[in-house]
């Protein structure tokens, strides 16, 4: 069960039998719920009752809502002694019941009884200790941002009609608009209130956290008060003065994080009192348009538009759009013509009630694509890398941009350019024409930048905090692709994670499992060095569970753990003779040789049992270690072999015999050493239900003489004492049981990923899991942040390749990298595969059909411009009509 939950916490509140009469009257005075009579069960009562004394209520009842009153006027109205009243008014301001105003001819301090939202409900929630002591004020804010609007929202015209908050676009997105509205420019308001700015905490982030629906942002300093509000925040200890330069830093950080700029919208076109930087997952103001499905409640004067012909389908706009207005679609025409995408229904000419609302908007706005699908490459990739995007960038010579785009999802592009199982290529639409685009070869070319310390790409740290990097200590147990990916994305978000690796060098199976003739270790080292420069601390030679325990790490201050130790053990065949000298597991053999001992000798004949890529790696490695005859035996037929076709062809080219349909029966020994193996005929591998259940003909056997037998029939997890005393449950294959979305185990601070969760799998799967683990841990270490709300489920749909009208494509053949003729590709441990030339990359990237494109629904767009800060091709916002702010 996640910490914080996905549903709002209910604070304990029992209406009193004898309500405080003055609080009822004050609640009724301020409420904007038309025709509603406030009772002790209402938020108007329990919100005020928590903080407001009867004496305060008496004074407030002498005031008019939103009508400024000087101290002298208050003395006259209440009959109280001036000094006593001034102290009381100050206390009322400190808790948030009152605000200040100096906008009068004498520039005289005036006290204002504000409305609830925006107003006292927010001010109540700008002091965390106040909310924690009285969580009912958090509910008060949430309810008063909801209840008064239920019947109003369908009638709100563009611009917001002076209700609540108004989205103001990213200024860079509208700089080129010739007739842009001045009030839609943040600079207009900063100029108007020049020199009078203060930063305070976000009341939405604070209050939603107390209610258990928080995000993982640091709440401090996202609310920028201007003019009188700046002074109010400082004088009531809710904020601090900042310079214009600091304002710009906060605004830029907000844009980097995908937050939406909003300004207050209750004082007409000539006045605001705050600029907020809002996370849609917790913002009560953005909720008014998103939950009620009425964009006019928020939208600016602008709407986004994608230039489809230029869109590279990177999907960044989709990922960040707070309103779910952008989704992935397709650029290619179907046999019936161009796809027309549905538009969001609006309340303009439709009866609008609760059945039209979207209570799950935070999750639904994270749906990535239309049901008709998008680019197959992005869909098929476990990490959902923007393949089409980086191919187009490479075609334009924008190699650093392409590398940056890949690293949004994969910190190991150079590694994956060499050893990925390229499901993107298997799914590539171009493959229906001739041959798939050589996606991994292009990725390898791009990632060559990472092998040079002068050109490698180190992503900027983007943390949702205005107070620097996060202090929480996080431990990653296992330095393989899952663990290192988790560390990479945590570091990119502002953490300083520590990786504990039991081996002498990090990399896991990338170093100790994949032979150097496929993946040179300097390639792995270079990409790990990027992580170090990003802030990841890697401690090698430390086995957690042996050298130090999880509990000891907790005492050192570690708040979360990501366990990704992989499957380092082997499985036995359960046959006679498998303990003989000369029998070795594939994992152990590769660990010795790939881990740095390439001088290891294998004399004589070798038999490899297994039909996967690991078995092929063993066969090829044995040959390089001197074995004069290598044979592979597997249960499956050649078409059923789990190994990739390319791998099978390569091992055959190197002289190994691949014998399908045989399983081990007995290993023959002489004086305790292997001298041969008896194999039995496999009739079938799976039963009628598809489960692994091999059937053999015990009478049909074959004996093969050999001196070495390598068993590549499965891997196991070596937990040791790592989980001693923990609540982590183990399931199928002795793997950790965890939530399939968050990877959180039964021990709340322990998350798992990679092979310890899935069983033996591919590097790209582990990389994808590592990024999700980082997202979960980021949420977990921030108190009361939801583990699931507003989380991108990373679900994509492949377009229908059978229903495409493919015309006018480039006729070039697939480009292939040359081999280095100075290297013996069959016996050397060096990688003989060269990289594509720049000219080949241009030819190959031109073969991409450009299947996908982002599609904007203008009816959902709120004109925030966040998409323009993420777009890597061409998306812009324009002014469809003069919507503006309504006075």
Q: What is each of the regions a protein language model found here?
A:
Residues 875-886:
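Single conserved hydrophobic/aromatic residue that forms the stacking wall/gate
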Residues 756-781:
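A conserved FAD-binding loop/helix module that cradles the flavin
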Residues 446-468, 493, 526-546, 570-625, ...:
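Glycine-rich dinucleotide-binding loop and its adjacent helix/turn
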Residues 473-496, 616-623:
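N-terminal Rossmann-like FAD-binding beta1-loop-alpha1 element of flavoenzymes
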Residues 93-104, 326-327:
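A short, conserved structural fragment
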Residues 108-144:
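Short, amphipathic alpha-helical interaction segments positioned at domain boundaries
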Residues 499, 503-538, 619-666, 787-800:
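Rossmann-like dinucleotide-binding cores of NAD(P)H-dependent redox enzymes
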Residues 579-603, 687-760:
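FAD-site-proximal beta/loop scaffold in flavoenzymes
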């Amino acid at each position: 069960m996640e910490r914080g939950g996905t549903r709002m916490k209910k604070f304990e509140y029992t209406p009193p039998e004898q309500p405080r009469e003055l609080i009822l009257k004050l609640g009724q005075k301020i409420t904007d719920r038309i025709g509603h009579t406030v009772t002790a069960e209402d938020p108007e009562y329990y919100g005020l009752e928590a903080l407001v004394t009867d004496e305060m209520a008496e004074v407030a009842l002498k005031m008019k809502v939103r009508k400024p009153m000087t101290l002298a006027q208050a003395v006259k109205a209440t009959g109280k002694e001036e000094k006593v009243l001034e102290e009381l008014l100050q206390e009322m301001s400190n808790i948030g019941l009152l605000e200040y105003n100096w906008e009068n001819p004498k520039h005289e301090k005036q006290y204002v009884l504000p409305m609830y939202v925006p107003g006292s409900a927010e001010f109540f929630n700008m002091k965390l200790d106040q909310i924690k002591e009285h969580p009912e004020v958090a509910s008060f804010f949430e309810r008063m941002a909801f209840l008064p609007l239920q019947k109003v929202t369908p009638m709100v015209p563009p611009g917001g009609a002076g209700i609540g908050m108004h989205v103001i676009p990213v200024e860079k997105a509208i700089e080129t608009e010739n007739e842009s509205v001045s009030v839609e420019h943040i600079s207009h308001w900063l100029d108007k209130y020049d020199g009078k700015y203060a930063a305070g905490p976000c009341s939405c982030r604070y209050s939603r956290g107390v209610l258990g629906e928080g995000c993982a942002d640091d709440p401090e300093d996202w609310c920028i008060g201007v003019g009188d509000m700046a002074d109010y925040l400082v004088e009531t200890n809710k904020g601090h003065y900042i310079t214009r330069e600091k304002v710009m830093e906060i605004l830029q950080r907000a844009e980097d994080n995908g937050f939406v700029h909003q300004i207050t919208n209750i004082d007409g076109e000539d006045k605001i009192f705050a600029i907020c930087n809002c996370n849609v997952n917790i913002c009560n103001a953005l909720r008014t348009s998103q939950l009620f499905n009425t964009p006019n409640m928020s939208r600016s004067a602008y709407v986004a538009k994608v230039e489809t012909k230029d869109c590279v389908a990177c999907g960044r706009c989709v990922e960040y759009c707070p309103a779910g207005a952008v989704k992935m679609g397709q650029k290619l025409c179907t046999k019936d013509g161009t796809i027309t995408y549905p538009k969001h229904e609006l309340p303009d000419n439709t009866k609008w009630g609760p059945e039209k609302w979207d209570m799950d908007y935070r999750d639904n706005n994270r749906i990535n694509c239309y049901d008709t699908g998008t680019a197959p490459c992005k869909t098929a990739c476990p990490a959902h890398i923007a393949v089409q995007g980086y191919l187009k960038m490479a075609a334009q010579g924008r190699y650093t941009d392409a590398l940056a785009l890949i690293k949004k999802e994969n910190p190991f592009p150079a590694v994956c350019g060499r050893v990925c199982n390229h499901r993107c290529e298997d799914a590539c639409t171009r493959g229906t024409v001739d041959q798939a685009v050589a996606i991994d070869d292009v990725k390898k070319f791009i990632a060559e930048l990472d092998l040079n310390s002068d050109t490698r790409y180190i992503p900027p740290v983007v943390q949702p905090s205005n107070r620097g990097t996060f202090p929480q200590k996080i431990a990653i147990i296992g330095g393989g692709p899952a663990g290192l990916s988790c560390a990479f994305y945590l570091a990119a978000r502002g953490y300083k994670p520590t990786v504990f690796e039991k081996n002498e060098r990090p990399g896991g199976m990338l170093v100790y499992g994949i032979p150097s003739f496929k993946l040179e270790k300097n390639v792995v080292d270079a990409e790990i060095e990027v992580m170090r420069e990003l802030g990841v601390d890697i401690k090698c030679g430390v086995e957690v569970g042996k050298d130090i325990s999880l509990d000891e790490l907790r005492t050192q201050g570690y708040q979360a753990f990501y366990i990704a130790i992989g499957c380092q053990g082997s499985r036995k065949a359960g046959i006679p003779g498998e303990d003989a000298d000369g029998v070795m597991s594939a994992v152990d053999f590769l660990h010795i040789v790939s881990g740095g001992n390439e001088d290891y000798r294998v004399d004589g004949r070798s038999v490899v049992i297994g039909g996967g890529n690991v078995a092929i790696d063993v066969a090829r490695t044995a040959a390089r270690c001197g074995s004069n005859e290598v044979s592979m035996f597997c249960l499956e037929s050649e078409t059923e072999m789990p190994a990739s076709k390319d791998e099978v062809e390569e091992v055959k080219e190197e002289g190994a015999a691949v014998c399908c349909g045989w399983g081990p029966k007995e290993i023959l020994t002489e004086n305790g050493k292997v001298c041969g193996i008896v194999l039995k005929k496999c009739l079938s591998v799976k039963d009628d239900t598809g489960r692994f259940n091999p059937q053999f003909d015990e009478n049909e056997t074959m004996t093969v003489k050999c001196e070495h037998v390598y068993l590549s029939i499965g891997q196991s997890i070596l937990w040791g004492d790592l989980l001693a005393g923990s609540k982590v449950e183990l399931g199928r294959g002795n793997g950790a049981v965890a939530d399939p979305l968050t990877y959180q185990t039964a021990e709340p601070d322990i998350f798992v990923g990679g092979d310890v969760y899935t069983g033996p799998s591919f590097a790209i799967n582990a990389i994808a899991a590592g990024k999700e683990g980082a997202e979960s841990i980021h949420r977990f270490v921030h108190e009361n942040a939801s583990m699931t709300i507003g989380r991108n489920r990373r679900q994509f749909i492949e377009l229908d390749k059978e229903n495409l009208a493919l015309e006018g494509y480039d006729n070039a053949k697939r480009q292939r990298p040359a081999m280095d003729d100075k290297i013996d590709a069959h016996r050397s441990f060096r990688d003989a595969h060269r990289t594509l030339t720049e000219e080949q990359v241009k030819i190959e990237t031109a073969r991409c059909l450009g299947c996908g494109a982002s599609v904007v629904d203008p009816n959902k767009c709120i004109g925030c411009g966040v998409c323009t800060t993420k777009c890597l091709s061409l998306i812009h916002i324009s002014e469809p009509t003069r919507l503006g702010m309504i006075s």
